[in-house]
């Protein structure tokens, strides 16, 4: 993902290993406290699989704090694994109303009945959407290079 300069490609192995027959699979991690109210951090509402704590189905994505009063909020990491036929299907849909409101393309898939599966990761990646985010990434890179 172009806006995540510090990304562990090993996480992709976990994502790919979870692809089953669903349309789309994506990643989430626990949101930090300061991310919960940040509209640049997309939150995911998930129904977790009863047999696999790290795997679930996305019910909704939002830039707001959803679900209300949750104990844990899930930060959506904008990396997707697609089935080829699902991607072709997705691009055939017009931009949806929820997609326009939230400015989140994955809502187009949900509004059209596509299934988005979610894989939990412990890794937390910094997406660069603002100058503040860029400063965080620069500091992290600087700290990593100083510790080496």
Regions found by a protein language model. Name each.
Residues 5-6, 125:
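A short, conserved beta-strand element in the Rossmann-like catalytic core
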Residues 1-2:
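Active-site acidic Asp-centered loop
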């Amino acid at each position: 993902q172009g806006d995540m300069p510090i990304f562990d490609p090993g996480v992709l192995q976990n994502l790919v290993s979870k692809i089953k027959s669903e349309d789309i699979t994506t990643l989430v991690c626990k949101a930090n406290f300061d991310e919960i109210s940040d509209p640049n951090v997309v939150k995911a509402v998930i129904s977790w699989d009863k047999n696999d704590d790290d795997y679930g189905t996305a019910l909704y994505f939002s830039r707001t704090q959803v679900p209300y009063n949750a104990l844990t909020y899930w930060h959506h990491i904008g990396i997707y694994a697609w089935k080829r036929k699902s991607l072709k299907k997705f691009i055939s849909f017009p931009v949806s109303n929820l997609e326009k409101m939230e400015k989140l393309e994955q809502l187009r898939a949900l509004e059209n009945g596509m299934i988005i599966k979610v894989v939990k990761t412990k890794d937390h990646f910094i997406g660069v959407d603002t100058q503040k985010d860029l400063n965080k990434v620069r500091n992290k890179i600087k700290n990593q290079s100083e510790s080496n």
